[in-house]
């Protein structure tokens, strides 16, 4: 079965904009319903897709938070170039971490983080999560168990996970620099 890669979206509505940021291994589909809801409330919403997301796990692990941060900044700059001066940011998981980083990096009106980590128990636990994601992705591709196991043995998400850990530490150290209204939703 061929998987169709998701696409970034922009839902035009009002003069104020919301940048919607997905999590690690996720994509814009994860925030699409929220985007439609906010559009109905008069907000223009834009959701990018970070490099390597929405595609194969092998492609995902070729990138790091430095690449994804550039994608976030490009999405923010895109809204600014379109004339949006009032931009809020809503992020899910890793997207929430990027939302916090935006809060002390560029002018924004407010932040919502949803289920965003500030640390993780172990790299092994994160590694297992990536491998579970990879296994499910490959099942959707229609691959058999032997093929999946062989491909997963070749997958090494270590550098991507290390970059997430570094980002979390950097954001933790800068939280006190955030001065805009911030809602933290944690479950």
Annotate the PLM regions.
Residues 25-36:
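The serine-hydrolase catalytic nucleophile loop
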Residues 38-57:
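Conserved alpha/beta-hydrolase
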Residues 56-82:
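Catalytic nucleophile-loop/oxyanion-hole region of alpha/beta-hydrolase
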Residues 86-89, 111, 184:
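Conserved alpha/beta-hydrolase fold motif
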Residues 91-95, 99:
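Gly/Ala-rich beta-loop-alpha elbow adjacent to hydrolase catalytic centers
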Residues 112-122:
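Active-site nucleophile loop of the alpha/beta-hydrolase fold
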Residues 157-174, 180:
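Active-site nucleophile elbow and catalytic-triad environment of alpha/beta-hydrolase enzymes
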Residues 177-187:
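Short beta-strand/loop motif that positions the catalytic acidic residue
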